[in-house]
């Protein structure tokens, strides 16, 4: 860059800093690049699939799927993980359907959980914005986008046609929220429902769509599609669901990874079940017939017994988890190492 351009840029930068504050504009090289903080989901498989060890702080996340697929369970487990690390959690219950007893079973400290059950969509999003701007919330869940009913719709008559009202509300709210979410380093999770598109469909196009317009699709850094794909039985009794979670969008790591995990009724995502599945895949857990062994020690006949053994021996489960993390977690290069590799590749 020639000297005249450098001087003009320097004047412009100093003027911007004077008007908008220090750090309003900066060179990327001047800024220390830090790893994105993440809150674990309670599912080791999903944490590894997300590529950063969980859901990213300072970002918007959308979790969607059919009814009873495990959307709220997943968010409550993330809240429990956050609280274990001393974080503060808030739950905006627009559906007025949160079960505190179930939340407690999943490990949520219900006494410390901030709960709001707003009357309108505007009220819900205004409360969310105020809590985010306080800078004291680590994770916030909004359940759900479909239940964020605009005030005009609530005050109107049944059958009134108000097209695009909720989509406009979401678009306006996200424009306002996103900057505050980044500044306060809060993880904000929107739970969303699926609807069927009405009209002519293109070949190969999915008839499913999420509610609340397209704004959330663009603003979300991570989008998860969660679906029940089967039942888990103990004899004739159904004790849980086999669930597939697909990372549909990920701005922080490669997307389109998917995991199949187990959600047990009254317990949530089966940590021990995941450890066994991943252990067998990584050849850390041996499976001979119906027997499972780890470290030369038999841990159970049948998956249910092996799961119970790991639950009764948490030190063994912790050791297996540490071994799996060592095997599956990507190693991070320092910036200098990364630069050297890039130079070598270029040569």
Curated annotation (Swiss-Prot):
<keyword id="KW-0547">Nucleotide-binding</keyword>
<dbReference type="InterPro" id="IPR020584">
    <property type="entry name" value="DNA_recomb/repair_RecA_CS"/>
</dbReference>
<dbReference type="GO" id="GO:0005524">
    <property type="term" value="F:ATP binding"/>
</dbReference>
<dbReference type="InterPro" id="IPR049428">
    <property type="entry name" value="RecA-like_N"/>
</dbReference>
<keyword id="KW-0963">Cytoplasm</keyword>
<dbReference type="InterPro" id="IPR049261">
    <property type="entry name" value="RecA-like_C"/>
</dbReference>
<dbReference type="GO" id="GO:0003697">
    <property type="term" value="F:single-stranded DNA binding"/>
</dbReference>
<dbReference type="InterPro" id="IPR023400">
    <property type="entry name" value="RecA_C_sf"/>
</dbReference>
<dbReference type="GO" id="GO:0140664">
    <property type="term" value="F:ATP-dependent DNA damage sensor activity"/>
</dbReference>
<feature type="region of interest" description="Disordered">
    <location>
        <begin position="327"/>
        <end position="347"/>
    </location>
</feature>
<dbReference type="InterPro" id="IPR013765">
    <property type="entry name" value="DNA_recomb/repair_RecA"/>
</dbReference>
<keyword id="KW-0067">ATP-binding</keyword>
<dbReference type="GO" id="GO:0006281">
    <property type="term" value="P:DNA repair"/>
</dbReference>
<keyword id="KW-0238">DNA-binding</keyword>
<dbReference type="Pfam" id="PF21096">
    <property type="entry name" value="RecA_C"/>
</dbReference>
<dbReference type="Pfam" id="PF00154">
    <property type="entry name" value="RecA"/>
</dbReference>
<dbReference type="GO" id="GO:0006310">
    <property type="term" value="P:DNA recombination"/>
</dbReference>
<dbReference type="InterPro" id="IPR020587">
    <property type="entry name" value="RecA_monomer-monomer_interface"/>
</dbReference>
<keyword id="KW-0227">DNA damage</keyword>
<keyword id="KW-0234">DNA repair</keyword>
<comment type="similarity">
    <text>Belongs to the RecA family.</text>
</comment>
<feature type="compositionally biased region" description="Acidic residues">
    <location>
        <begin position="337"/>
        <end position="347"/>
    </location>
</feature>
<dbReference type="GO" id="GO:0016887">
    <property type="term" value="F:ATP hydrolysis activity"/>
</dbReference>
<dbReference type="InterPro" id="IPR027417">
    <property type="entry name" value="P-loop_NTPase"/>
</dbReference>
<dbReference type="GO" id="GO:0009432">
    <property type="term" value="P:SOS response"/>
</dbReference>
<comment type="function">
    <text>Can catalyze the hydrolysis of ATP in the presence of single-stranded DNA, the ATP-dependent uptake of single-stranded DNA by duplex DNA, and the ATP-dependent hybridization of homologous single-stranded DNAs. It interacts with LexA causing its activation and leading to its autocatalytic cleavage.</text>
</comment>
<protein>
    <recommendedName>
        <fullName>Protein RecA</fullName>
    </recommendedName>
</protein>
<dbReference type="InterPro" id="IPR020588">
    <property type="entry name" value="RecA_ATP-bd"/>
</dbReference>
<feature type="compositionally biased region" description="Basic and acidic residues">
    <location>
        <begin position="327"/>
        <end position="336"/>
    </location>
</feature>
<keyword id="KW-0742">SOS response</keyword>
<dbReference type="GO" id="GO:0005829">
    <property type="term" value="C:cytosol"/>
</dbReference>
<keyword id="KW-0233">DNA recombination</keyword>
<dbReference type="GO" id="GO:0003684">
    <property type="term" value="F:damaged DNA binding"/>
</dbReference>
<feature type="binding site">
    <location>
        <begin position="65"/>
        <end position="72"/>
    </location>
    <ligand>
        <name>ATP</name>
    </ligand>
</feature>
<dbReference type="InterPro" id="IPR003593">
    <property type="entry name" value="AAA+_ATPase"/>
</dbReference>
């Amino acid at each position: 860059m020639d000297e005249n351009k450098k001087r003009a840029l320097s004047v412009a930068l100093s003027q911007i800093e004077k008007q908008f504050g220090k750090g309003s504009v900066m060179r990327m090289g001047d800024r220390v690049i830090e790893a994105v903080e993440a809150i674990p989901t309670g599912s080791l498989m999903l944490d590894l699939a997300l590529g950063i060890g969980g859901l990213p702080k300072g970002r918007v996340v959308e979790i969607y799927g059919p009814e009873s697929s495990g959307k709220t369970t997943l968010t409550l487990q993330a809240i429990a993980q956050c609280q274990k690390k001393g974080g503060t959690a808030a739950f905006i219950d627009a559906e007025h359907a949160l079960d505190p007893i179930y939340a407690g079973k999943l490990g949520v400290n219900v006494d410390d959980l901030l709960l709001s059950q707003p009357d309108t969509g505007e009220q819900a999003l205004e409360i969310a914005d105020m809590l985010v701007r306080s800078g004291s919330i680590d994770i916030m869940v909004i359940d759900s986008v479909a239940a964020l009913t605009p005030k005009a719709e609530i005050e109107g008559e049944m059958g009134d046609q108000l097209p695009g009202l909720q989509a406009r509300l979401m678009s306006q709210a996200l424009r306002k929220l996103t900057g505050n979410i980044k500044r306060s380093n809060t993880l904000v999770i929107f739970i969303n429902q699926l609807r069927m598109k009405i009209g002519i469909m293109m070949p190969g196009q999915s008839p499913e769509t999420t509610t609340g317009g397209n704004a959330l699709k663009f603003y979300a850094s991570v989008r998860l599609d969660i679906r029940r794909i089967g039942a888990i039985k103990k004899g004739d009794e159904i004790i849980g669901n086999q669930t597939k979670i697909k990372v549909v969008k990920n701005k922080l790591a490669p997307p389109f990874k998917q995991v199949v995990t187990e959600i047990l009724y009254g317990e949530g995502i089966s940590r021990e079940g995941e450890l066994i599945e991943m252990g067998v895949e990584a050849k850390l857990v041996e499976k001979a017939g119906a027997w499972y062994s780890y470290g030369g020690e038999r841990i159970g006949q049948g998956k249910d017994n092996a799961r119970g053994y790991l639950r009764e021996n948490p030190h063994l489960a912790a050791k297996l988890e540490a071994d799996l993390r060592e095997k599956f977690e990507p190693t991070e290069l320092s910036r200098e190492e990364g630069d050297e590799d890039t130079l070598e590749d270029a040569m």
